[in-house]
Amino acid sequence: MAGNDCGALLDEELSSFFLNYLADTQGGGSGEEQLYADFPELDLSQLDASDFDSATCFGELQWCPENSETEPNQYSPDDSELFQIDSENEALLAELTKTLDDIPEDDVGLAAFPALDGGDALSCTSASPAPSSAPPSPAPEKPSAPAPEVDELSLLQKLLLATSYPTSSSDTQKEGTAWRQAGLRSKSQRPCVKADSTQDKKAPMMQSQSRSCTELHKHLTSAQCCLQDRGLQPPCLQSPRLPAKEDKEPGEDCPSPQPAPASPRDSLALGRADPGAPVSQEDMQAMVQLIRYMHTYCLPQRKLPPQTPEPLPKACSNPSQQVRSRPWSRHHSKASWAEFSILRELLAQDVLCDVSKPYRLATPVYASLTPRSRPRPPKDSQASPGRPSSVEEVRIAASPKSTGPRPSLRPLRLEVKREVRRPARLQQQEEEDEEEEEEEEEEEKEEEEEWGRKRPGRGLPWTKLGRKLESSVCPVRRSRRLNPELGPWLTFADEPLVPSEPQGALPSLCLAPKAYDVERELGSPTDEDSGQDQQLLRGPQIPALESPCESGCGDMDEDPSCPQLPPRDSPRCLMLALSQSDPTFGKKSFEQTLTVELCGTAGLTPPTTPPYKPTEEDPFKPDIKHSLGKEIALSLPSPEGLSLKATPGAAHKLPKKHPERSELLSHLRHATAQPASQAGQKRPFSCSFGDHDYCQVLRPEGVLQRKVLRSWEPSGVHLEDWPQQGAPWAEAQAPGREEDRSCDAGAPPKDSTLLRDHEIRASLTKHFGLLETALEEEDLASCKSPEYDTVFEDSSSSSGESSFLPEEEEEEGEEEEEDDEEEDSGVSPTCSDHCPYQSPPSKANRQLCSRSRSSSGSSPCHSWSPATRRNFRCESRGPCSDRTPSIRHARKRREKAIGEGRVVYIQNLSSDMSSRELKRRFEVFGEIEECEVLTRNRRGEKYGFITYRCSEHAALSLTKGAALRKRNEPSFQLSYGGLRHFCWPRYTDYDSNSEEALPASGKSKYEAMDFDSLLKEAQQSLH
């Protein structure tokens, strides 16, 4: 039977318990005797106390069934309660939380536990004065009832037993079962068992035979209780971090410690436990955190309204000053947290943001909800008007104290926590706030100028957390859930604000921001004179400092919180108004430091990250609703100057252009506006095509133009494009260009054009080497097709062989001659002047051709450049040209490209294939210098040539280019191009057949060709 009892525990758990147990009892008497008394089921006669240092010793234990005869039915496998353990445990935990929340702080007797006023009333009543905190057997069946007076159950034990089962002698078996589970659950606290075990063992061992629960279970249960009592109380006094966390959640989550301070018995136990068996802060913290975690995530019941919130204030006056901060936090917590629900808060608030994405919010909604607990007390106080007023008075009185030295954040939290129950708490808060405000103001002055014009719409609440603004440590996601380590600060920040934000104080707050703002503007680091108002503003602002949005966003009920935080205007107070009621503050104080970071973290392309807009724009709309005075007060301190009404005081800080809330946004707007204003100027389409506008602006014009030309349709813009690429010639020929400008209304000034040309040439030279040749090749790259030739004749965009016009080859020859003559003769201005195509606006492309020709014709550096001649030849339809040099250069260039294997010959093109489309498809393999589509007049078939800049790209296109065709198109036949296809009608290349035959016959392209394509290829080779 006893085996069943201990069978619930793992061997290692049992062994560790015994080791701890022995360690605790070494000073109290024979370990063997006590063990035997506590665990009658074990026959320890075989073992020495020295044997217990080994974890394996328990394997030798013999279980004595005769010792457990008294409780045969306790462990009966038929006990139906065994199957209810899981559900009971859950109910037990929930009931524990609920009951403890309802316990008055002055009365910790059984009267507080309705379930215990029955059979255990006597033992519990005697529990308070009992000198020993060691809980005895939970429910004695035998007449050993008086024994509980000395060997009393711990408060938590009784609660555990009472909540799950009504305590009575008939329910002892159930209690035993529950205790077994409690023992199992308490193994996480096992390290601390040692500290309390001595007290537990002080209880008389006479009842061990008759107890319904083994001492092991009792001990484990009591250990948990004691651990909580000590772990929660001392931390309030000693650990700066614990108080914050406990105040915020343990107040409700682990209420057991709360009654403890008020209960003499608990205080005795605490006093005894600390000196006798000190528990490390880490253990207590771990315990508290575990309990709080369990309650926070598992027990929504804890948020039910407390049944006895009134008694809580008693704790504040309770003589046990050791937990001085605790009573206040409890009062706060229970008043607010019992009803607090994140979901309820979110639903209740008019949240303008997407709550599901806390990282998108300037201040996480979760963090901002905590302040709800702050407002709650004000609400309670509002119910009793005396309280809010007192709070305000305290704040006002505290304002002079703001000069006090500013303690470190954590100690600061502690101090405030302790005094939170008293108005002094507000004073300390305000002191801290003002001290931080002074530091913040200095930082703000600098930061505001730096960040004042970054995205005002987005602020980060936590930038101020550890004075780490400068290091940009402000995390965007500051919710207790995501950042539990910050929980204490968050909660604390929320709570202090409550008194400072009574709605009654709202008018004063509104006025206060003005005075405060004025001082802010002056930059006085110590705003103590405006202090009282500022105190009201700043007192909450330390908390706001931590979760600035909390007061503004979470406290939807209280507009004052909004104005309060904005006046402080600290860059860390990044308040986003999540509700229409809080817009004033929300808009005004935004952290500019993180605006760019926020924008960038979501995505560096604002067009693709609309989520920043709601937080950025919505907060501004509500501002209009607020009174002008408030807006002015808030706007003055706000570095962003987000307020629509810029007051003269803050004018120097406020950017006048409200719509442009960030540098990036303004930059983009300027970039987009520029093309509109430039309509008819150089590159109006630069912002409409290619990469993002803000990326394009920074790129060299040559690169941009190449990209744009692919998608740009002829609309007369080409007239404006030519000056860019013609820079070299334009430099030499200012007059010619001026004439051209007369034709091109709105052409950019000469200086700007030259500057762009220099940039283009520099980038091209750096990448390709020889300036003019590279420039021409770059410029002509996109002019290979007839469409390109007609539309972008002037652009000369990176196509070294634009001479191959898809138009009539004879016409090309004539154009070549004309262009060559013109260029060689160097009659640029005359040509452009008398060129018949220059005047008609309808033929803008031809005008450009002539102008380009004229401007470049006289340029000595271009007289020898074949690319230039070809380009102009293609573009020009004018009368003057000399073709011999261009033919010569074109032939050399083609021969060079073919010899390097950079020319790809594509046959079997669809009838609707254009050079532009062909180039667009094959650009995936690499940069294309030239692309043209030609038609065989005899058969009407289309074929094309693509000249890549790199031979590797050409080889890649040969192997994979066949896959670029559409389903309704015939298969492409690709091969290395021969000279024959580039020859003018009067020129014959006798080697082209042999050069072309080799690739055509032995290339892998045939592997990708279907039968029809192969047949056509064979037929073509025969002709």
UniProtKB/Swiss-Prot annotation:
It is found in: Nucleus. Keywords: Activator, Nucleus, Phosphoprotein, Repeat, RNA-binding, Transcription, Transcription regulation. Residues 132-146 have a biased composition (Pro residues). SMART domains: RRM. Residues 429-450, 806-825 have a biased composition (Acidic residues). The gene is PPARGC1B. Its main location: nucleus. It comes from Homo sapiens (Human). Induction: Repressed by saturated fatty acids such as palmitate and stearate in skeletal muscle cells. Induced by insulin and reduced by aging in skeletal muscle biopsies. Down-regulated in type 2 diabetes mellitus subjects as well as in pre-diabetics. A motif (LXXLL motif 2) lies at residues 343-347. This is Peroxisome proliferator-activated receptor gamma coactivator 1-beta. Residues 122-148, 165-210, 237-278, 302-331, 369-463, 520-567, 601-623, 636-683, 717-758, 779-867 are annotated as: Disordered. The modification Phosphoserine is found at S384, S524, S638. Residues 793-805, 849-866 have a biased composition (Low complexity). Residues 412-422, 614-623 have a biased composition (Basic and acidic residues). A motif (LXXLL motif 1) lies at residues 156-160. Plays a role of stimulator of transcription factors and nuclear receptors activities. Activates transcriptional activity of estrogen receptor alpha, nuclear respiratory factor 1 (NRF1) and glucocorticoid receptor in the presence of glucocorticoids. May play a role in constitutive non-adrenergic-mediated mitochondrial biogenesis as suggested by increased basal oxygen consumption and mitochondrial number when overexpressed. May be involved in fat oxidation and non-oxidative glucose metabolism and in the regulation of energy expenditure. The lineage of its organism: Eukaryota, Metazoa, Chordata, Craniata, Vertebrata. Signal peptide: none annotated. Residues 902-976 form the RRM domain. GO terms for molecular function: AF-2 domain binding; nuclear estrogen receptor binding; RNA binding; transcription coactivator activity. GO terms for biological process: energy homeostasis; estrogen receptor signaling pathway; positive regulation of cold-induced thermogenesis; positive regulation of osteoclast differentiation; positive regulation of transcription by RNA polymerase II; regulation of DNA-templated transcription. GO terms for cellular component: cytosol; mediator complex; nucleoplasm; nucleus.
